[in-house]
């Protein structure tokens, strides 16, 4: 992930985002060649590895995708405008922001989620709904001013029956289940 040169006028800029691999990069370079079943698990596994050479080798496939400006405090729409400017000028990737409607319905959200899953470069499991206002970001946990809309129809969840659970004590005396 290359360095980001912040343009003049963005003093003390703080951006929040997440590390992702595009569907294309995962399919082309890692699907079936790794123990990770999907792009999200692949990135989590890569970041969690203790092997720095493995991280270095595969980091070129990982993108930092921004989705919020924490400082300065801006309305949601202005945050995305700022991120879009940085994306165009600095090749910083950002999530897509669009006004859907002032009257949201399940049908409208399902349609938007389906279209987003199809056209987005990254694996998407939901969309975030929020009002275009200034908000204080929480120190921990999810923000109270926004919520994630997901639909079971669009997820890769499977139902399974657990036949047995083996409980083992860890070195710190915690019980850990093994299915």
Which sequence ranges carry the predicted segments?
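RNA/tRNA-interacting regions in translation and RNA-turnover enzymes
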Residues: 1-179
């Amino acid at each position: 992930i290359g360095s980001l040169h912040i343009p003049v006028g963005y003093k003390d800029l703080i951006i929040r985002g997440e590390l992702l691999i595009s569907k294309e990069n995962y399919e082309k370079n890692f699907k079936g060649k790794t123990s990770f079943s999907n792009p999200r698990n692949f990135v989590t596994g890569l970041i969690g590895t203790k092997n720095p050479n493995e991280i270095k080798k595969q980091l070129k496939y990982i993108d930092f995708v921004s989705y919020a400006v924490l400082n300065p405090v801006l309305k949601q729409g202005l945050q995305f405008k700022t991120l879009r400017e940085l994306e165009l000028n600095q090749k910083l990737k950002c999530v897509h922001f669009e006004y859907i409607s002032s009257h949201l319905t399940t049908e409208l959200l399902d349609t938007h989620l389906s279209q987003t899953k199809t056209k987005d470069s990254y694996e998407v499991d939901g969309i975030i709904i929020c009002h275009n206002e200034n908000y204080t970001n929480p120190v921990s946990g999810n923000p109270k001013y926004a919520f994630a809309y997901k639909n079971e129809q669009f997820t890769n969840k499977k139902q399974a029956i657990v036949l047995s659970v083996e409980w083992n004590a860890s070195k710190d005396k915690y019980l850990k289940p093994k299915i």
